[in-house]
A protein has these predicted regions:
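Non-catalytic peripheral regions of patatin-like phospholipases
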Residues: 60-107, 147-150, 160, 198-293
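Active-site gating loop/helix substructures
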Residues: 18, 125-225
């Protein structure tokens, strides 16, 4: 396939600030090979969503060229991530602005206030498409924010939404037990089903968790496992950047261990299917934390 024909999808996994830093390196590798211009779709989870949101915020809401990324954006992002303790800022916001059970909403405020992530999806460039992946508590499905769609097939979709970037990112990073759900008031929005027909929301409140509860790779917007694997229409080559770490040994201690084991096994199955797909079709890469690129 010619370079000019590439339509690259980036699936950037969760993993907190560690993931954000790892993904900066993957983007650097693409920029060094003048490939950022070929990126057509970015799907991000948790810390990766923070990374991409900061990238847009520091580049006038545009996805950077390879040259811009290397000379200006990467140094700026590194300084911001390393010098601003977002977790500490979010805790302060939670104490003074919200009830402490709304820590995810406090993260949104901290992202806007301390990282400068303002505006909505309607303010960022149309290409590449950016899908911020969350998990719906109510439906148990993959809930997505992007320039052209907000919602999931089981709950419905928001029409004409310019949803705030910081809020979508905070929802994507709302890890159960540590942070809790991000809460959305559904009443101000007009909802529709997949065909575009107006519907009434199933509840007044919608609660979103970290996208990693459903898919820590953020693969689904780009790659589907059906029919031996297939890409979305806007992608013909993809890179799964896995910044996660393997499950470690732990003595019996907490019930949350069952979540660790289940999530790890789901990720392993997704990774195996994706690796098999790109091996058969020669149309992707799978860099993993600790294994290089």
């Amino acid at each position: 396939m010619k370079r000019s024909e590439l339509k690259i999808g980036l699936a950037l996994s969760g993993g907190g600030i560690r993931a954000a830093i790892y993904h900066l390196g993957v983007l650097k590798y693409l920029a060094e090979n003048n490939l950022l211009e070929q990126v057509t779709h970015i799907s991000s989870v948790s810390g990766a969503s923070m990374c991409v949101g900061l990238l847009y915020a520091k580049n006038n809401m545009r996805f950077p060229t390879s040259s811009e990324y290397l000379t200006t954006i990467l140094p700026t992002l590194k300084e911001q991530i390393l010098n601003v303790n977002l977790e500490q800022k979010a805790i302060i916001e939670a104490i003074f602005k919200f009830k402490f059970n709304k820590k995810a909403n406090a993260i949104a405020l901290a992202l806007a206030k301390h990282w400068g992530i303002n505006g909505g999806f309607g303010d960022i460039s149309k290409k590449p498409l950016w899908s911020v992946v969350c998990t719906s508590y109510e439906t148990g499905k993959h809930f997505r924010f992007s320039q052209d769609i907000v919602g999931d097939w089981a709950f419905g979709y928001i029409k004409d939404s310019n949803f705030p970037l910081a809020d979508a990112i905070a929802a994507s990073a709302a890890f159960p037990f540590l942070i809790g759900t991000y809460e959305i008031d559904t009443k101000p929005f007009e909802w529709c089903d997949k065909s575009g027909t107006k519907i009434e929301p199933k509840s007044d409140k919608l609660h979103l968790w970290d996208g990693g509860v459903y898919d820590n790779f953020g693969l689904e917007p780009i790659y589907q496992m059906e029919n031996n694997g297939m890409y979305s229409d806007d992608v013909n080559f993809s890179i799964l950047s896995n910044a996660g770490k393997s499950i470690s040994f732990q003595s019996k201690k907490t019930v949350t261990r069952i979540v660790d084991v289940t999530t790890d096994q789901i990720s392993i199955l997704r990774a195996r299917a994706f690796r098999d797909f790109i091996f058969r079709n020669k149309n992707g890469y799978y860099p993993k934390n600790g294994s290089g690129i």
